[in-house]
Amino acid sequence: DLGVVASIADKVAVMYSGEIIEYGTVEDIFYDSRHPYTWALLSSLPQLATTEKLYSIAGTPPSLYSEIKGDAFAPRNPSPMAVDFVEIPPKFPVSDTHWAKTWLLDNRAPKMSKPEGIQDLHAKMLKIYDQAGGANLG
């Protein structure tokens, strides 16, 4: 439950298919996430001030019993790159406290903006954070 995590944790590790795919402070993950799976998780958080249907991640998680080639999230990623299906991404540093395993952070990757919904969500969460005086979201 990301809401609980935000209210009690200082650091967050986002896991997918048994691997940590993004790591950082609460602020890094909630306001500047970089992995498409983290974006999908944040998009699926219920918003109290809306009646919109919750976002649902397409597809199913991979079996932990079969070998995964490339980025495990690639088949469910709405905008995967070819490299996602063949090579596991390394940890790419975002800052001294934040890293993510996504080819989007490779300097050879095409420059992509965060999905509009994530940009809006990051802005909303940052506003809540600022109103709370910089305290955790809880």
Model region roles, listed by residue range:
Residues 25-132:
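Short catalytic/signature loops enriched in Gly
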Residues 132-138:
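NTP-binding/hydrolysis catalytic cores, primarily Walker-type P-loop NTPases
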Residues 15:
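Catalytic metal- and UDP-sugar-binding loop of GT-A-like glycosyltransferases, i.e.
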Residues 1:
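Aromatic-residue-lined binding/catalytic grooves and analogous aromatic/hydrophobic interfacial grooves
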Residues 11, 23-24:
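Short, glycine/charged-rich "phosphate-handling" switch motifs in NTP-dependent
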Residues 5-7:
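A short, surface-exposed alpha-helical micro-motif characterized by mixed small hydrophobic
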